Amino acid sequence: MIEIWTEKYRPKSLSEIYGEDENIQKLKSFVEKKELPHLLFAGSVGTGKTSTAIALAIELFGESWKENFIEMNASNENGIDVIRNKIKDIARIRPSNPLGFKILFLDEADQLTAEAQAALRRTMEMYSETTRFVFACNYSSKIIPPIQSRTVVMRFRPVQDEFIKKKLNEIAKNEGFTIDDESMEAMVEVSGGDMRKAINVLQAVYTSGEISPKKIYEIIGYASPESVNKLISRAINGLFDEARQIVDKMMIEDGLSGIDIVKSVHSIVRASVVPPKQKIEIIKALADAEFRIVEGSNDRIQLDALIARIADIGSKIN
């Protein structure tokens, strides 16, 4: 049975969490004092919130961490009845460990309704002796102020490129293979600061038997930078038909959707040497195209319109 690398190589201690030195130092201080406040981890997907919570539990409880760490996902259980019944029942139970409390980790807490959060705040107050709540969310602004004021808020940033490279190289070494520079850069690019995504891509390309930028873009659903650069160049220079042919190839031969193409173009444009004013206009055009496609508009028509807008913007540059 194939083991999932995101689980196999999940950090086992706080020291193994990369790029969050300030947060890790605070957590280590809590561990040393054997005292833990309620916590709120805020940050985008793949920035290490869950891994940090698990590493914290391991350091606090040692080998018995699984018995003292309850993980729930609020997106699956976001109603007030769940708070009043299930979570309340879990929170009231006193654990048998020497610390006298357990951790209830609630992922995607920003998916809870305001009413459910209000009920949860009361549960936190009632059972703070037996349960420490650790919340994880993408947007702290969606967490009601009464909960924020009762937690230590820690913000997690996208993982820096150097730490993603370090982790991927560690995994590759342990699995007995190497990653060439071009493939590494491609994985860093498509991960966008998401460590979990980077590790999943690495396992996927390794399993495919081909570690190359081409395979990476194929697996992740991105167009190759070469194709995207050609598309942008043709569009900016007003070569509408040639740009459409490139889009046709991406969609028909490479199997990319309209959203895939828009995201690929956006990634290249952000790093391009297009003048700032025109770059802003192109990004606005990309945002409009993405919105319309998501709302159900025809991919082909929206991509044609996008090429036309980029051509118009390009005429101002030329």
From Swiss-Prot:
InterPro entries: AAA+_ATPase, ATPase_AAA_core, DNA_pol3_clamp-load_cplx_C, DNA_Rep/Repair_Clamp_Loader, P-loop_NTPase, Rep_factor-C_ssu_arc, Rep_factorC_C, RFC_lid. The gene is rfcS. CDD domains: AAA, HLD_clamp_RFC. Heteromultimer composed of small subunits (RfcS) and large subunits (RfcL). This is Replication factor C small subunit. GO terms for cellular component: DNA replication factor C complex. It comes from Thermoplasma volcanium (strain ATCC 51530 / DSM 4299 / JCM 9571 / NBRC 15438 / GSS1). Keywords: ATP-binding, DNA replication, Nucleotide-binding. GO terms for biological process: DNA repair; DNA-templated DNA replication. Pfam families: AAA (PF00004), RCF1-5-like_lid (PF21960), Rep_fac_C (PF08542). The keyword Amino-acid biosynthesis does not apply. One of its GO terms (molecular function) is ATP hydrolysis activity. ATP binds at residues 43-50. NCBIfam families: PRK00440.1. SMART domains: AAA. Part of the RFC clamp loader complex which loads the PCNA sliding clamp onto DNA. HAMAP family: RfcS.
